[in-house]
Amino acid sequence: MTYSIRIADLPLTERPRERLLSLGAQSLSNAELLAILLATGQGKGKLSAVGLGQHILKELSQHKRDPLDVLRDMSPQELMNIPGIGPAKATTILAAIELGKRAFQLRPMEKVEINDPVSAVAALSHDLMWQNQERFAIVLLNVKNQIIGTKLISIGTATETLVHPREIFREVLKQGATKLIIGHNHPSGNVAPSQEDIDLTEQLLKAATFLNFPLLDHLILGNGNHQSLRTVTDLWIRYPQEG
């Protein structure tokens, strides 16, 4: 398949819209999903919609980051610098990205029970998942592990955030919570815990044990990924928490 073949000239089984209808959106490549948003290519004899989608991804791959990660942060003007992308195409792409963010970041209703890292990630996503600066937030729980609320504690730089145990447990007391989950984001999308993350978690587990407010997990979020320190460290074995 070449970039200049029109979608209308493709067999039905190879057209992005038809493939989405028959196989589901998850079966399409990134270029095919972009092609559906673009609707048209660059015109006769030039790139088709799929070809233009491939060209966009190729251009963005020069940033040494995942092309979709780059695309997520682009402004309309930056998108329109790519040949073949005008205001209509740029705004359609960015509207789709924003809608996806909002769907992913929906807050759970209060009193939802947190029983695994995934449900806690859903509670923290609005504040942490797609942010360009490091942020630290907490999920406040009652005795039944139901959400009382979430609270953004601090906002740092692109690479670090500063938080003190006093700020965290003050909020726990203020909201009448009995347990908590803490979380922060890595804007890079690499959710592997750093030594600083591990050290902070140990410090907070000691404080939680002393104050009798069980700390159930420390989650790292970023660009659609997440990691639970409870599952990848032995800290909760060394500092057992009720609940």
Curated annotation (Swiss-Prot):
| Single Gene Ontology MF annotation | metal ion binding
The MPN domain covers: 112-235
Find motif (JAMM motif) and give its ranges: 184-197
Q: Which Pfam families match?
A: RadC, UPF0758_N
InterPro entries given in the database record: MPN, RadC_JAB, RuvA_2-like, UPF0758, UPF0758_CS, UPF0758_N
**Which keywords does this chain's UniProt record carry?**
Hydrolase, Metal-binding, Metalloprotease, Protease, Zinc
Q: Which residues bind Zn(2+)?
A: H184, H186, D197
Give a GO biological-process term: proteolysis
Which family is this protein grouped under?
Belongs to the UPF0758 family.
Q: What is this protein called?
A: UPF0758 protein PCC7424_2073
Q: Which species is the source of this protein?
A: Gloeothece citriformis (strain PCC 7424)
The record lists the lineage as: Bacteria, Bacillati, Cyanobacteriota, Cyanophyceae, Oscillatoriophycideae
